């Protein structure tokens, strides 16, 4: 995806929208711009969600929402206001994470929020903020990566490796040998980051793996979902997965991984996300659902994939129905999923245009 175009369009206050379209189903999270939603369940049972939005003089902020009733309703409880993202300096693709164990001086339960900050006029960075009060207030922590040139760093994602280290995954455009690749760095304290290592990096310069999402399975194995763009043909930007036994070693970076598709050949392209149910079931969603021949499938914007263990992917209805999503930074773009503690329900947040504004909607449906 051309994320820099997205950032610049938002800074300019200009949104390219369809002429007329029915907005997504579900409830509105906020009644103005809400991009790149994320949702997590905390150890205390509360659900937190975040979106990127813009206020004032094109100030990019992270809006933090809380649900105390299993996702039936949300209330804004906090705001991440990074001065480096103020005055049109650019903000994109934020993530939200709760530490399940202490990392350095940060206790279990510390919240982390990170996003891509900057645009083409200065080196981009992945800036991390932390909260010790369940998302009410936030303070700057560190950068897990800073660009060495004017190319982009995108889509930060956190995980805790088997050895207890905090890992930051991201998409990197700064290497001339790769149009884009997936990278990871680790930290023992969340402040100092080290050992930048590729996780997905094609031997073809123009290939663009991106948008990593990492989850730990009940078995202890780690699973990463991502897209690979730049390949051309019907599988351009198709969704893939790969596994790691320890949350750091992901196999050969040049291997594309496993294509995410159903037994009858349907697959997702663009902006996939991944969720793991407590019972071990896996759920994925992508922006566009395609048929085996590459045509857009009838359930596009209204479908999730689910599978149990080593089974095959099958389709189920998506809680939020987005009408005919297409390759664009808003409709059904990187829609996060959260499965209930009993593994029976799934909460989805998905964005779509409403009267020319990209907004985020949420709803809950069956998880299988």
Task: Write out the residue ranges for each language-model feature.
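Secretory targeting and sorting signals
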Residues: 1-23
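Conserved blade-ending motifs and adjacent loop-strand segments that build the rim/top face
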Residues: 257-269, 313-340
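Blade-level signature of beta-propeller repeat domains, shared across WD40, Kelch, NHL, RCC1
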Residues: 337-368
């Amino acid at each position: 995806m051309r994320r820099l175009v997205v950032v610049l369009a938002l800074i300019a206050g200009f949104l390219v929208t369809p002429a007329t379209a029915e907005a997504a189903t579900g409830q509105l999270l906020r009644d103005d711009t809400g991009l790149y939603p994320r949702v997590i369940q905390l150890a205390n049972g509360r659900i937190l969600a975040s979106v990127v939005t813009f206020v004032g003089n094109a100030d990019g902020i992270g809006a933090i929402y809380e649900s105390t009733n299993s996702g039936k309703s949300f209330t804004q409880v906090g705001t991440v206001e990074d001065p480096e993202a103020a005055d049109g300096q650019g903000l994109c693709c934020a993530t939200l994470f709760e530490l399940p164990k202490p990392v350095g001086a940060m206790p279990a339960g510390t919240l982390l929020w990170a996003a891509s900050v900057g645009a083409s006029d200065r080196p981009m960075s992945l800036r991390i903020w932390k909260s010790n009060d369940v998302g009410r207030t936030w303070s700057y922590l560190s950068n897990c990566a800073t660009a060495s040139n004017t190319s982009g760093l995108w889509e930060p994602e956190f995980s805790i490796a088997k050895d207890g280290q905090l890992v930051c995954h991201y998409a990197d455009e700064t290497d001339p040998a790769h149009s884009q690749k997936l990278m990871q760095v680790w930290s023992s304290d969340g402040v100092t980051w080290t050992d930048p290592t590729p996780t997905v990096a094609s031997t073809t310069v123009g290939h663009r793996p991106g948008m990593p999402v990492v989850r730990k399975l009940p078995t202890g194995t780690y699973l990463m979902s991502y897209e690979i763009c730049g390949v051309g043909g019907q599988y351009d930007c198709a969704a893939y997965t790969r596994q790691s036994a320890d949350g750091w070693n992901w196999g050969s970076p040049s291997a594309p991984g496993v294509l995410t598709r159903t037994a009858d050949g349907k697959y997702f392209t663009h902006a996939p996300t991944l969720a793991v149910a407590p019972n071990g079931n896996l759920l994925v969603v992508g922006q566009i659902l395609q048929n085996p021949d590459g045509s857009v499938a009838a359930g596009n914007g209204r479908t999730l994939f689910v599978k149990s263990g080593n089974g095959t992917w099958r389709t189920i209805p998506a809680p939020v129905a987005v009408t005919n999503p297409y390759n664009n930074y808003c409709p059904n773009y990187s829609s996060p999923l959260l499965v209930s503690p009993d593994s029976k329900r799934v909460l989805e947040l998905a964005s779509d245009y409403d009267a020319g504004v990209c907004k985020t909607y949420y709803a809950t449906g069956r998880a299988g």
